[in-house]
Amino acid sequence: MFDKQEFVSKLVTEEKAKIVLLVMDGLGDIPVNGKTPLQAANTPNLDSLAKESDLGQTIPVLPGITPGSGPGHLSLFGYDPIRYQIGRGILEALGIGVEVGEKDVVARANFATWDGKVVLDRRAGRPATEESAKVVQLLSEKIKKIEDVEITFYPGKEHRFVVKFTGEGLGDNVTDADPQKEGHPMVWAEGLDEPSKKTARITNELIKKIAEVLKDNPKINFALIRGFSKYPDLPKFPQVYKMKAGAIATYPMYRGLAKLVGMEIIETGQTVADEIKTLKERWNDYDFFYVHVKKTDSYGEDGKFEEKVKVIEEVDALIPEIVSLNPDVLVITGDHSTPVPLKAHSWHPVPLLIWSKYTRRGLSQAFNEFECARGTLGTIHASDVMTLALAYAGKLEKFGA
């Protein structure tokens, strides 16, 4: 089978370059009252940059396939998201520093609100991180083992936490214990092979125990568990692309994904401004920077149009600070689309901007979904973005005589 990443890796040179990949999570959208959030936002800096850039749009997996954030990011990093299928559990776990061993299966979990029949709120009203941490502590005291499997809880951000299952004979080929939509009955975990059936059985029992412990809490009274995974083996980004890579991200899952591919995690603050400040402070320490903005996705999932607009404007105001660093290549895109009307990830193509001194300037007027659809790069697979970034940075040899 043709391995595109391996093919590209053989063409990568030792040439020094600075590349910034700015991922605005869930950036792509569809019009509401005639405009997408990108179109409605006041973005003079992004629009000015677009006039000096090549634009296009990406397909993260395949046309019509709605990607999770894991596949969406793997694609952007140049990995085949179908070949490397990774559960969100390992990403979240690594992102918060969980040690994962050979006997472990980890999963990502949400606190939720449940009325005994249907899931009313998949995120339990997005409780504060501190509040969730107290609930996780309570669960840690009350639930330590199911059958012969040790259960360990780790707090994440807001409604999120991680569960680690440690024991013999556990598999990770388990369906999500999550209906995926509110107002629907619970969908319980199912194992798709014998070891995974054990994991599923213990997971379902665990959720029932959690519900019992939290039965008196009006909002945080249930849990959804998904993204079961063991530790996978992937080619490492620094070796593939011959670049020292640093990740600036506030949310554990994205830190975990970056760590999984071999990037170093750079500590930063909680705001986008903090992240760009960190980028400037650590500019001389890395060749490649991955910078992640989460709230564009969060507000898309919550159906909050104006809030998504404000995050885009917040990022726009910081663009001059990135440009002032004079990177060889600046890529601005999303890992997938999260349209406000859908309140969920979608299959829609994702806007893409590539800025360098080698772009065909003057062909685009603004950065939005429709200008990108008309852009010089066309519609490409997201796994080609990294190849293009390397090319624009002068880090690829010619192929063939």
Curated annotation (Swiss-Prot):
Enzyme nomenclature, EC number: 5.4.2.12
The reaction(s) this protein catalyses: (2R)-2-phosphoglycerate = (2R)-3-phosphoglycerate
GO molecular function terms attached to this record: metal ion binding; phosphoglycerate mutase activity
Disulfide bonds listed in the record: none
SUPFAM superfamilies, alphabetized: Alkaline phosphatase-like
Pathway linked to the protein: Carbohydrate degradation; glycolysis; pyruvate from D-glyceraldehyde 3-phosphate: step 3/5
Domain of life of the organism encoding this protein: Bacteria
Top EC class, one word: isomerase
UniProt keyword terms in alphabetical order: Glycolysis, Isomerase
PANTHER family xref list: COFACTOR-INDEPENDENT PHOSPHOGLYCERATE MUTASE, METALLOENZYME DOMAIN-CONTAINING PROTEIN
Function: Catalyzes the interconversion of 2-phosphoglycerate and 3-phosphoglycerate.
Protein name: Probable 2,3-bisphosphoglycerate-independent phosphoglycerate mutase
Gene encoding the protein: apgM
